[in-house]
Amino acid sequence: PALLDRSVEPPIRVFESGSILLYLAEKFGALLPKDPAGRTETLNWLFWQMGSAPYLGGGFGHFYAYAPEKLEYPINRFTMEAKRQLDVLNRRLADNAYLAGDDYTIADIAVWPWYGQLVRNNVYSAAEFLAAHEYTHVQRWAEEIAKRPAVIRGQRVNRTWGDEDSQVPERHEAKDLD
């Protein structure tokens, strides 16, 4: 993804999800703690997602859900990695409401579409295969985030499939989502 911030002169170009999240959090002073420990913890998890998600999407998701031929070795290999990543998240969320601690941050925004939606069985139809029910803390976190009004609205942006009530194929103003 890419963003061009025309609210400044000269316009600033920003690309890649993590960079966009960090840029917007700094620009608007939200979703990124200001204290060094909280900020660092948030960035740790943001960058964890940047490094981990390709194994989930490009590895597990591809071989489990999309590959034209189901090959045992890559499915087993990437399943093991997906479960390891879910375990890392589950351990973190056992003692924390959100990834960086008590507050919802850009780390949660980055991680939830991949791992939260995975355990909710909304990507790859793999929750049962991965025994997602065993990751109870990830499940709790995923459900809490799914109920956030901004998340509910955000999932409708540029959506062209599913129930018509859940679609906003083109967005021009914030009121388009209300």
Q: Which role does the model predict for each range below?
A:
Residues 78-86, 114, 141:
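Alpha-helical packing segments of well-folded alpha/beta enzyme cores
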Residues 3, 20, 89, 108, ...:
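Residue-level signal for nonpolar/aromatic packing positions in well-ordered secondary structure
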